[in-house]
Amino acid sequence: LQDAVNAIGDGMGTIQVAPGRHSDCAVQGAGDIAYVAATPGQAVFDNVACEGKGALVLRGRSAKVAGLVFANIRVPDFNGSGIRLEKGNLTVSQSWFRDSQQGILAGIDTASSITIDKSTFTRLGTCEGPGGCAHSIYIGDYGSLSVTRSRFEAGRGGHYLKSRSRRIAVLNSSFDDTAGRGTNYMIDLPGGSSGRIANNWFVQGPNKENHSAFITVAPEGKQYSSAGL
């Protein structure tokens, strides 16, 4: 996998991932790369992480991920992720993140956007680490985040979706905490955000660490306006 990423370099290309369980991981440092399952749902990145971070560590111009499964990813700092996004645009579709410390963890890139569609996040999150909780999705200070037609379920700690992005859209998705353990909020916007949260389905589970809210807005202070949210 890394050889294929290196071959594309600063250009544009598509990597087709064959069915099966893969112990490969890759770091993308440039270019625009699509990672596509040859058969959606049958290509699994299992128990593998590059740089002690995640199966795909992305810091190029853009990346697209389609039809892939990320499973059993754990690292010593408790932030093991299917995708670790450090900068650039990201589009994820028809993918499954499960049984890991985090699904997607993104850093800071206020000029870029993240789009997630038709994807599932199962048994993710942990509060084991000394640095605080990991979450199913945790997005840093990004330009925008869009999550549509996706499912979050059976969390294992932290929040289902935490985002510090300036703009947010969470539409037509489900958050089922019925089988969750030690979970917190469904959606946490710690610094505020503007946009739209609509047509979602929320089920509060019995084994939560925090039952106080489904959605929180600016609990850590107002970094961005939430006017019109």
Task: Give short role names for the model-derived ranges.
Residues 14-19, 26, 30-78, 125:
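Right-handed parallel beta-helix/beta-spiral solenoid domain characteristic of secreted/periplasmic
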Residues 6-11, 28-29, 58-59, 85-86, ...:
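Flexible, charged surface loops at secondary-structure boundaries
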Residues 105, 113-114, 127-128, 145, ...:
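Extended, compositionally simple hydrophobic/Ser/Thr-rich segments
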Residues 196, 202-210, 225-229:
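Glycoside hydrolase catalytic-domain groove-lining segments
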